[in-house]
Amino acid sequence: MSEGVYEKFLAPEEPFPLLSQRGNFSEDATLDVSDFGCQLSSCHRTDPLHRFHSSRWNLTSCGTSVASSECSEELFSSVSVGDQDDCYSLLDDQELTSFDLFPEGSVCSDVSSSISTYWDWSDSEFEWQLPGSDIASGSDVLSDIIPSVPSSPCLVSKRKSKPHRNLDELPWSAMTNDEQVEYIEYLSRKVSTEMGLREQLDIIKIIDPSAQILPTDSEFIIELNCLTDEKLKQVRSYIREHSPRQRPNITRDNWKRSMASNGSTSGVSAHSSSNASMVSSTSSSTASTGSNSSTNISRAHSDGNLATAAERIRDSKKRSKQRKMQQKALRKRQLKEQRQARKERLSGLFMNEEVLSLKVTEEEDHCDDVDVLM
């Protein structure tokens, strides 16, 4: 490209000769681009700009609504005008007057703000490529300038999933903190849904032999420091021996999947329904029917035990309340008698009190009545 072309490109004699020839440049410094074919070249290797759905985004659809932007020394705006002989790249010089190419609120304004949001152009290193142009041949046609931008720093690389460990085979000391909490939750759910009240009490005694459980207690908190490798081994053995044989064993993976599908680990009925759905999806219809029936039998047995225990608790509470009321009435009567005796002693009116006892025989009952009014 000749020296004259560079001079005309970098320091034109008239400010923005391109605008004076083709566009209607008004006093408000707006640009009528109805005669122009403006194209904004998207940056390659830029993942956040995939929403443009193409490698080039045609701005002629915006009409006269184009974004407000000021080109810095590092950023060039590529504008192709009609025939290629009149193509110029606008370079913003600090001495030149800045003007609004694109008013705010337009589609292109959103594009400009998106570009400025994802990258700091002043800190980026660009590798300018001129495809289709031959500088050595002296061609004065500038093709689309495509900056090579580093990949966005906001993209996070996917983490490699940790290898799965079967907690049913690990000793307590080999588990991490999170694995211990997860396994305790799994055991609590399994014991509370599959076993009766007596089995639950036995497991609690294995974990903490000194635990005291009152009839009014509805839950038991398991401390992590109470468990050891030997206690966990005993608990696993007890669960294998006393778990219902007709009911398929719930593995830890199935429990985790059921909890994720329900979104909560608090509902026993929700867990039972999700487990039943998993059994029906992985086995035949006959096997699923048998497992569901055994599940219902086991659950009914557990519900019966819980109902009996609840009734005993209500009766004990009722008897305790009645006993407290009787003790309160007796204490109140004793205090009243003591208060009355103290008043009589202080008044001195009953110092010469004589108590007479009257005894009526049966013979006198048959005597004639005496009329006291006579």
Curated annotation (Swiss-Prot):
A Pfam family per the record: FAM199X
Basic residues: compositionally biased ranges: 315-334
Transmembrane segments: none
The keyword Coiled coil is assigned to this record: yes
Chain intervals for the UniProt region annotation (Disordered): 238-343
Keyword tags: Coiled coil
Record-stated family: Belongs to the FAM199 family.
Name of this protein: Protein FAM199X
